[in-house]
Amino acid sequence: MTETLSLRAKIEQSPMGAYQWMIVAMAAIMNLLDGFDVLALAFTATAIRNEFGLTRIELGYLLSAGLFGMAAGSLFLAPLADKIGRRPLLLMAVLLSTIGMLGSAFISQYQWLGFWRVITGLGVGGILVGTNVITSEYSSRKWRSFAISVYAAGFGVGAVLGGMFAVMLQGEYGWRSVFLAGAILTGLFLVLLFIWLPESIDFLTTKQPKNAEVRLNLIAKKIGLASDWKLPEKIEKVKTKLPISQLFSEKYLHSTLLIWTAFFAIMFSFYFISSWTPALLKEAGMTTEQSVSVGMMISLGGTCGALIYGLLA
């Protein structure tokens, strides 16, 4: 019999197969749709502001609503993965994004747009956390850094595609068509995820849901590691689990603050620039197409950077 605990080790040591790269591709496409969904409002901000007569402050609230939802989704939705599994969480998160984008396309008051942006953000937050774990689990040690960079690059690609859709659709069908297109694309991909997305190997071996062993062997077979994999003895309680307060202990406080500050600064600058650049350039005298194109170039640069740094890592 094969030791189940060595399955992850076997994946780490083995070459990446087509099935594993398909999982990386699905994670990248989920991140691509996130980029489309998150920045759709930035690319349509001028048209929305004109239709509802919004002030800059009101527009700022709308641009922040999706980011608030992302933060809430990452903090409160993503932890459900440890209880229900990565696959159900990701399916639920993609469904939330689909509903949020669809609702945004049919609003009659701008306050409702803020509500639907929060719903979209909740889904995006759950997706961002879950896809990172799935990508890491199914990647070999040799290709993990590159696989994660491919997944991360999806966000920028989605933003670029979002800009292209915004330019093509807004002039012909109005800003609502951009959100409708995002909802349709996200909904269609949800169906593909339901068919092909596997469960986390760690979740199957530690939580051991119904038919876990059968599902584990099916995954192993698709990877090309077909054997009689057995589940390890289930551990009911982890006594050594450390509380989150340990991050703020004297030993870790300095590192915690440095990491949090750096990450906050990066995310703040990225989303501030990405969200406001098209609208500000439009006010400065550029056409809608020109302002959106500049926003697309920012995302394109991020995509290239993610791939280059992934290869260097």
Region spans (language model):
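Extracytoplasmic gate region of multi-pass secondary transporters
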Residues: 41-42, 248-306
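Glycine-rich segments within core transmembrane alpha-helices of 12-TM secondary carriers
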Residues: 145-171, 185-186
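Cytosolic juxtamembrane N-terminal segment immediately preceding the first transmembrane helix
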Residues: 1-36
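Conserved MFS/SLC helix-loop-helix module at the cytosolic interface between two early adjacent transmembrane helices
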Residues: 72-110
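Helix-breaking motifs and short loop linkers at transmembrane-helix boundaries and internal kinks
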Residues: 53, 85, 106-112, 123, ...
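Helix-loop junctions at membrane interfaces in 12-TM secondary transporters
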Residues: 105-116, 171-173
